[in-house]
Every structure is written in structure tokens, then in C-alpha cells.
A protein has these predicted regions:
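Conserved short histidine dyad/triad with adjacent acidic residue
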Residues: 40-59, 95
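A short, N-terminal "cap"/entry segment at the start of jelly-roll beta-barrel domains
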Residues: 1-47
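Short beta-strand segments
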Residues: 46, 81-83, 99
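Short acidic-glycine-tyrosine-enriched beta hairpin
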Residues: 78-95
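Short, conserved beta-strand element in jelly-roll/cupin
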Residues: 58-73
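Short, surface-exposed beta-strand-loop junctions and turns on beta-sheet-rich folds
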Residues: 63, 79-81, 108
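Short acidic, glycine-rich loop/turn motifs
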Residues: 39, 75-77
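A short hydrophobic beta-strand segment most commonly corresponding to one strand
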Residues: 92, 100, 104-113
Length: 113
């Protein structure tokens, strides 16, 4: 929990990575880590990171800002054009979207969900 009136360096925050479920992995051996920093009026704020590889996910309702790294996000359900993301990208995801993340450089994002 990040107490009010304090700050954290999101780029340097240590994260404990774990392998993604084999059923989600399309290629490579990606790992991911999340740390929740707290909630604001019931909305979680945190940092998430994924190492290179390709994996599918069922999304939560969230907005995120990419801090570092690069990836392509393919929208499988609903079918939408893929997007390329990198430092400074701001992306909106909706609950239930099915995505495929192809991370080419370890991707770290700050999310609000």
C-alpha cells in the first residue's frame, strides 16, 4: 500500500516474477509480476511487468501507461486492429477483452483497474 503523501519510483520497484500459465503462453517462456500499490475509491493502482514472449489474456477494465519496454497487443475478442505500445503509450482495455501480448522488450506499465 502506498500511503497518501508518499511516492515510489515505478521504474525501479522490485517485482517478483512467476511463469505465466502454460495454457496462456503462445511462444517463448514469458514471466509476469504485479504489485498493487493501493486503491482509490475502490479502484486498484499498481505496476505490472511481462518479459519477452507471447501470451493470451482475458482483460480487466483498466487504463495503463507504459513505463518501459515494447509490445504488440492483438485484440482477439472483440476483433480490433493490433496496436504497438512503448514508453508513454496510454491504453484502455475493457472487461472481458481477449488479447494476445507479444512482448519484444520487457514491458512495465502502471495500471488503474
Amino acid at each position: 500500500m502506498l500511503p497518501a503523501g508518499t511516492g515510489v519510483d515505478a521504474a525501479a520497484l522490485p517485482l517478483a516474477h512467476a511463469p505465466l500459465p502454460a495454457s496462456d503462453v503462445v511462444s517463448g517462456s514469458p514471466t509476469a509480476a504485479t504489485v498493487a500499490l493501493g486503491e482509490i475509491r475502490g479502484v486498484e493502482v499498481g505496476v505490472w511487468e511481462m518479459t519477452p514472449g507471447t501470451a493470451c489474456d482475458r482483460e480487466a477494465d483498466e487504463v495503463f501507461v507504459v513505463m518501459s519496454g515494447r509490445a504488440r497487443i492483438a485484440f482477439l475478442e472483440p476483433a480490433l486492429p493490433s496496436i504497438e505500445v512503448g514508453p508513454g503509450s496510454i491504453v484502455r482495455l475493457a472487461e472481458g477483452m481477449r488479447t494476445e501480448w507479444t512482448v519484444t522488450e520487457t514491458l512495465r506499465k502502471v495500471y488503474v483497474a
